[in-house]
Amino acid sequence: MNSISPSQSYVHMQELILPNDSNILGNVLGGKVMHLMDLCAAMSALKHCRNQVVTASVDNLDFLAPSKIGDFLILKSSVNFCGNTSMEVGVRIDTEDRKTGILKHTASAYLTFVAIDENGKT
């Protein structure tokens, strides 16, 4: 893989929390957050190696605070480390309160990706 700076793998995504994405308490579903984290991190990994990647593992996924219907999830990711066969991507999620504009850190995770060729091999 070519050596590039973490800033070149940076991805910023935003998602509006809708009722279909929430539980009975009006909080976003953890599975929805995990899905968005995986997408955001995968884009960083793709930008880094310019090749197909697969998620190998998710480490240290921490849900720090709930996010509510109508709030904005703000996801940021970049490659933290790249080895010979895999790379670690860090993802941070902040939630912007739709009424006040106040941001709070709501989740973080580290994901490991592996680059694969057109035959699905590493």
Question: Which functions belong to the PLM regions below?
Answer:
Residues 20, 24-25, 35-36, 65-70, ...:
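A broad, structure-centric signal for solvent-exposed, well-ordered loop/edge residues
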Residues 2-13, 68-69, 80-122:
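HotDog/MaoC-like acyl-thioester-processing domains
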Residues 2-54, 114-122:
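Hot-dog-fold acyl-thioester-processing enzymes
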Residues 16-21, 60, 67, 110:
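Generic hydrophobic-segment detector
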